[in-house]
Design a protein with these regions (language model features):
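Periplasmic plug
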Residues: 104, 110-163
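Transmembrane beta-barrel wall of Gram-negative outer-membrane proteins
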Residues: 192, 197-228, 232-270, 289-312, ...
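A beta-strand signature from Gram-negative outer-membrane beta-barrel systems
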Residues: 94, 138-140, 149-194
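C-terminal beta-signal and adjacent terminal beta-strands/loops
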Residues: 2, 559, 736-748, 774-852
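Face-selective signature of the C-terminal outer-membrane beta-barrel domain
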Residues: 255, 296-327, 331-516, 611-614, ...
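Gram-negative outer-membrane beta-barrel transporters
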Residues: 407, 411-412, 495-496, 500, ...
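Structural signature of Gram-negative outer-membrane beta-barrels, strongest in the C-terminal barrel
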Residues: 401, 413, 420-432, 475-618, ...
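Membrane-embedded beta-barrel scaffold of Gram-negative outer-membrane proteins
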Residues: 306, 312-318, 322-328, 544, ...
């Protein structure tokens, strides 16, 4: 089988066939570029001769046959070949055990799941994956979130997905670590420009240029892109502007480089919508807008130096500055059981005094007023009960995060007796400063689902309203954190075919919160200082009895310290609506994950790659955001134990010169292992419904064995690539996933009754196909077509149970159901879904000049 310069078509790695799919993707990409180049490697496994970085910093370079885990890799050619608009799209289509939840319904804001652990841009999502760029941790200090839009896809040279709780990757590596390496002018010389356009107002342009000097070792690389789309859903435009640059100097003994990344992005993701409304209009939205503005600066000074034939040093020093502003228009669920239509005499007088006219003197009701507003306006003027009479709420947040740090490690090749050693010892220091402010303003829902705000004494949710249910949504929090780490790894060659790895890392973290609104540490104050420390070990072994098969097994531990947002929102007596409110809190514990995995991988006759593996990850004191009611309020708590275990299988074959195909299958069992009682107002099995008061606030009981929502049990990925000539390439890939319970249905017992509760409480299984075509009319030029969701399948990858405040005609309605025996008005509850994108096509033109 022909080989590519980077990776042979045959690799013994354990990446699921999705990885294999990428391997082929890379192979076809290379072949498509020139008449005679060998096929590139796919996202599958690494070749036997290829080495991978087994730690964030360079230096721990191990042949893949010595890595005791199902590591997956991919290159920039793999991503280009699949026409993936961003990193997360590529991973979801091409890498084994990876799925996404499009909770925000924006392509650049997904939750990325790997083996049931998540890296998400959304506060409140349990984070369990660490992400690194050139050795710098990208999980942000505030909530460990990952903003996928902040780094340009085209700057990525390669990625490595490391499974398990590998302690070498530090905090938050509970289920895995994603390590990204960027391009440079030595390995990526030349110039490229690309333009694209497609449906839903999609337009984009990107460029890259790089080079190096043979005389003095200087090298440089720059890439940038601009992208806009109107979005396929109502009022959902997004704009991305990204720039990455690197300059460095290579000497005979090493390299020094300085890289910079800038991002200026405006994202709109209008989230979930009630199931019935989606059936009527798949592009409809519940309320608008849901805007996120990210501005980011990233600087990284990195070096690698060979100190001798056996000893080397690598290190970096970095600085990040991220500004995030959000502006969200939401339904105020507190109004759904209130009388919000006809203003009373005092309210009419206040309206008249303020100069309003046209308000009804009598008779306003749900039947004749689809979008009520007058009682809301009057209660804002009176500062009386806008929290109950206004059906809209505008939430705004401002987050500023500065984090900086440095790391260094020594790598030594040594021999003791007959045993060879690959030793790595390192240290790291990371610090951050965070400021977070928030406010909420009352308003009313317009027919277009936007929120109109009103000026007046009661305009803001500051707790001053004359209402027993008044709440204060203001937050003014500052936080500082410091983490110091020491780590060590030793890979021992017990025999030429057997390698044992021992590793460990010690982390010490301090988090200090300062509350500007309620200082002093008393009741309701966010002030506090929290310290967490832990040593996490790892052990693994590989045995390669022949070049065609490798056995591996291992066990490791990772941990995660609670962040400022979790430490400030942990009191069940004062739930938060993330990111709307914080409260004084009881202490939280670190999350500790222990992972066991074993498997084998191999190749047959240079034409077949395969892998099979099993894994189990047990979380102790898992940090979960527990919903308190249907409107999104809740709190963080340590949740006893959870477990993710599963099977991974992959296959990649090349049956003929022009054909490559394969796939991977992931079977995941993600469950709660501890009994717990949590809020479950949207769930038909809640305690209130059991007591004869459906549609009102209640709790649900989670039992050991109940499945964690939004993590499909079965995921199958298949691909086939056809390259009839050097000028043409056609690729087809498919992702199929089983249905899952939605959030709020943690006990799996929600069932519709058609009146108080609607929707199934689950997502349905689905299969989505994607088609790509490349044509190279002449050297350097490429025209491409990409169609996603080829058969226009309606599907959802995310959902939750929540209040349904709209009729089948799209009108807002309060007190939609008659009062119960207790005099309380039930609120209809439904299943809300974040709809998947419909069939979308775009075309592009790329020109590449590699120079001499």
């Amino acid at each position: 089988m022909p080989r590519s310069p980077r990776a042979p078509a045959v690799a013994h790695r354990t990446a699921p066939v999705a990885a294999a799919a990428l391997l082929l993707c890379h192979m076809l990409a290379a072949r498509a570029q020139a008449p005679e180049p060998p096929p590139p490697a796919a996202v599958s496994e690494l070749p036997t001769v290829q080495v991978i970085e087994a730690a964030p910093l360079p230096g721990l370079e191990l042949p893949r046959d010595q890595v005791p885990g199902n590591v997956q890799t991919a290159t920039d050619a793999d991503m280009e070949r699949m026409h993936a608009p961003d990193l997360t799209n590529f991973m979801s289509r091409a890498m084994g055990s990876v799925t996404v939840n499009e909770t925000q319904a924006n392509p650049f804001q997904p939750d990325v799941n790997y083996r049931g652990f998540t890296a998400s841009p959304l506060l409140g999502t349990p984070q369990g994956l660490s992400v690194f760029l050139d050795g710098v941790r990208l999980n942000q200090p505030f909530g460990d979130v990952v903003s996928w839009d902040l780094f340009p896809r085209n700057a990525i040279s390669s990625l490595t997905l490391v499974p398990g709780s590998n302690p070498l990757f530090g905090l938050n590596t509970l289920g895995g670590a994603l390590s990204l390496q960027t391009k440079d002018g030595i390995h990526n010389p030349g110039t490229m420009v690309e333009i694209l356009g497609g449906q839903y107002g999609r337009v984009g342009a990107q460029f890259e240029t790089g080079g190096h000097s043979e005389s003095n070792g200087m090298h440089w690389y720059v890439t940038g892109n601009a992208y806009h789309e109107d979005g396929w859903r109502t009022a959902s435009p997004s704009d991305l502007r990204q720039l990455f640059a690197k300059v460095g100097q290579r000497t005979g003994n090493g390299d020094v480089s300085l890289s910079m990344a800038l991002a200026d992005n405006d994202l709109t993701g209008n989230g979930s919508q009630e199931a019935g409304a989606l059936q009527r209009d798949w592009s409809s939205v519940r309320t608008i807008p849901d805007e996120t503005k990210n501005r980011a600066l990233f600087l990284n000074l990195a070096t690698t130096q060979a100190l001798s034939d056996r000893l080397s040093f690598s290190g970096n020093a970095y600085y990040r500055d991220i500004k995030t502003n959000t502006f969200n228009g939401d339904m105020n669920d507190e109004s759904l059981d209130q009388a919000i239509y006809q203003p009373n005499a005092a309210e009419r007088a206040a309206l008249a005094e303020a100069g309003y006219s046209g308000f009804p003197t009598s008779g306003e009701n749900a039947g004749n007023t689809p979008f009520p507003k007058w009682r809301c306006i009057a209660n804002i003027l009176l500062n009386d009960e806008p929290n109950e009479k206004c059906n809209g709420l505008v939430n705004e947040t401002q987050t500023r995060q500065k984090n900086y740090g440095l790391a260094g490690q020594f790598s030594l090749d040594a021999v003791t007796g007959s045993v060879g050693h690959k030793l790595v010892a390192g240290a790291a220091y990371d610090a951050s400063r965070v400021s977070f402010t928030q406010g909420a303003q009352f308003g009313y829902i317009n027919p277009d689902r936007s929120i109109a705000t009103v000026a007046g004494p009661g305009a803001f949710a500051d707790g001053t309203q004359e209402s027993e249910d008044a709440f204060d949504a203001r937050v003014d929090l500052s936080s500082r954190s410091h983490t110091g780490s020491l780590y060590l790894s030793d890979t021992m060659a017990l025999r030429p075919d057997t390698h044992l790895t021992l590793a460990g890392r010690y982390n010490h973290t301090t988090v200090r919160n300062a509350d500007a609104l309620t200082p002093g540490g008393g009741p309701g104050s966010l002030d506090g200082e929290h310290t967490f420390s832990r040593f996490n070990p790892a052990v693994g072994i590989t045995w390669a009895p022949s070049e065609s098969v490798t056995f591996y097994g291992g066990a490791n531990q990772g941990s995660r310290a609670p962040t400022a947002i979790e430490l400030g929102c942990a009191d069940p007596e004062s739930p938060c609506k993330l990111p709307n409110a914080f409260a004084g809190d009881p202490p939280l514990k670190q999350v500790v994950t222990t992972t066991f995995e074993a498997g084998l991988r191999g190749a047959v006759a240079g034409q077949v790659l395969w892998n099979f593996g099993v894994f189990r990850s047990d979380n102790k004191d898992d940090l979960l955001f527990v919903s308190d009611d249907s409107s999104g309020f809740g709190y963080f708590k340590n949740f006893g134990k959870t477990r993710r275990q599963g099977i991974e299988m992959g296959l990649h074959v090349k049956p003929a010169a022009a054909w490559t195909m394969g796939g991977n299958l992931s079977l995941l069992d993600a469950t709660y292992r501890t009994a717990e009682t949590v809020g479950g107002t949207g769930n038909s099995s809640n305690s209130a419904a059991a007591d004869g008061a459906p549609g009102t606030e209640g709790t649900i009981d989670i039992r050991p064995g109940d499945r964690i929502p939004l993590l499909p049990r079965q995921v199958l990925k298949l691909y086939v690539d056809w390259e009839p000539t050097a000028l043409w390439h056609v690729g087809l890939d498919m992702t199929a996933a089983s249905g899952t319970a939605v959030r709020g249905n943690e006990n799996g017992q929600d069932a519709p009754d058609g009146l108080y509760y609607t929707g199934s409480g689950r997502t349905s299984g689905y299969a989505v196909f994607n088609l790509g075509v490349d044509y190279k009319p002449r050297p350097g030029w490429k025209v491409f077509l990409q169609v996603t969701n080829l058969f226009d399948r309606k599907y959802a990858t995310a959902g939750q149970l929540g209040a349904n405040g709209f009729t089948s005609d799209g009108a807002y309605i309060a007190r939609a159901l008659p009062a119960n025996a207790n005099g309380d008005y039930p609120v209809p509850q439904g299943t809300l879904y974040s709809p998947g994108a419909p069939r979308t096509a775009w075309v592009g033109l790329r020109y590449t000049y590699k120079g001499s």
